[in-house]
């Protein structure tokens, strides 16, 4: 986990339940006095996420039973990496630390987890979040209001068949946005969701059920095709955003996206690797500006990734 992630050493479930009593029925004290939560129970997932967001970020979040429930620790990893990227970029460009930062979250979901975390941590950040699912849009907007973020976080509806980087298409000037974030649909269609276990083992654990819909979790061609479209759209929007970023769940997808960046002669890109237990996930960032990130932000130490640079 990221060095600034407060969950690096795990979570004390009992202490968390004391701070968020609704979680108490799902916390078990084991014979060795350790505590555990059965994340195979969807309600336990939702309450655990709500508890962390409430205790550690002061956020009150509604999480529908039939939509994806995000895990806070690995979502925070991504936010912290983006923060690091922006810090290096601001220093290189001579921009003030207290400047207004504006970002985009693609496919924000019902929780709007990324912009919620970002806006709660950084008071000078504002975000536009896109979503195609109407129930997710409605719930995310309620979450924005519940946390008094209307002035800093806008949820906009987009289309499955339309462009992905809609806010950039509507931008009025160069570098109007500092970054994009995205947790793309992982699966290649509903059948892939039924047969693949590749997305398990990260977040709530291998036995935890997925509560998301096909619209949230699947797209034709899977995550690689989705992010590839982002890359192609960025070619015409390059000066409107400093850094384009996205999560990736599969190593194969990472290789495909790096290959596409190279094909378009985009040499300014960075990779991040998240490790949780035996499972690895990745993030990719690319840019058309002259600022190059240091190796500790852009080149994971994993030797299996060395051919990507």
From Swiss-Prot:
Motif annotated as NPPF, chain positions: 183-186
Classification via InterPro entries: METTL16/PsiM, METTL16/RlmF, SAM-dependent_MTases_sf
Molecular function GO terms recorded: 4-hydroxytryptamine 4-phosphate methyltransferase activity
EC number: 2.1.1.-, 2.1.1.345
Pfam short name (any one): Methyltransf_10
Binding-site positions, Mg(2+) 2: 272
One biological process term in Gene Ontology: rRNA base methylation
Catalytic reactions of this protein: norbaeocystin + 2 S-adenosyl-L-methionine = psilocybin + 2 S-adenosyl-L-homocysteine + 2 H(+); norbaeocystin + S-adenosyl-L-methionine = baeocystin + S-adenosyl-L-homocysteine + H(+); baeocystin + S-adenosyl-L-methionine = psilocybin + S-adenosyl-L-homocysteine + H(+)
GO (cellular component) term, any one: nucleus
Subunit structure of this chain's protein: Monomer.
Function (record text): Methyltransferase; part of the gene cluster that mediates the biosynthesis of psilocybin, a psychotropic tryptamine-derived natural product. The first step in the pathway is the decarboxylation of L-tryptophan to tryptamine by the decarboxylase psiD. PsiD does not decarboxylate phenylalanine, tyrosine, or 5-hydroxy- L -tryptophan (5-HTP). 4-hydroxy-L-tryptophan is accepted as substrate by psiD as well. The cytochrome P450 monooxygenase psiH then converts tryptamine to 4-hydroxytryptamine.
Protein name per Swiss-Prot or TrEMBL: Psilocybin synthase
Source organism: Psilocybe cyanescens
Gene coding for it: psiM
């Amino acid at each position: 986990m990221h060095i600034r992630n407060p969950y690096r050493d795990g979570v004390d479930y009992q202490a968390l339940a004391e701070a968020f009593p609704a979680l108490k029925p799902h916390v078990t004290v084991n014979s060795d006095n350790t505590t555990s939560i059965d994340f195979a129970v969807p309600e336990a997932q939702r309450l655990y996420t709500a508890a962390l967001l409430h205790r550690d970020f002061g956020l009150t979040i509604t999480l529908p039973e039939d939509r994806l429930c995000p895990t806070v620790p690995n979502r925070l990893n991504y936010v912290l990496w983006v923060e690091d990227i922006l810090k290096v970029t601001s220093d290189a460009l001579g921009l003030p630390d207290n400047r207004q930062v504006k970002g985009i979250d693609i496919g924000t979901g019902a929780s709007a987890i990324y912009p919620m975390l970002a806006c709660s941590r950084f008071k000078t950040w504002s975000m536009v979040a896109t979503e195609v699912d109407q129930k997710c849009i409605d719930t995310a907007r309620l979450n924005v209001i519940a946390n008094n973020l209307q002035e800093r976080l806008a949820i906009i509806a987009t289309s499955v068949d339309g462009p992905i980087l809609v806010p950039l298409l509507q931008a009025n000037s160069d570098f109007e946005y500092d970054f994009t974030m995205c947790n793309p649909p992982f699966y290649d269609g509903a059948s892939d969701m039924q047969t693949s276990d590749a997305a398990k083992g990260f977040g709530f654990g291998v036995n935890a059920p997925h509560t998301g819909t096909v619209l949230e979790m699947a797209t034709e061609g899977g995550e690689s095709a989705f992010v590839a479209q982002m890359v192609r759209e960025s070619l015409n929007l390059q000066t409107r955003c400093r850094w384009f970023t996205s999560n990736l769940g599969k190593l194969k997808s990472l290789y495909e996206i790096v290959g596409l960046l190279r094909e378009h002669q985009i040499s300014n890109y960075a990779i991040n690797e998240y490790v949780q237990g035996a499972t690895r996930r990745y993030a990719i960032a690319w840019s058309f500006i002259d600022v190059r990130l240091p190796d500790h932000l852009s080149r994971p130490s994993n030797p299996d990734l060395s051919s990507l640079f």
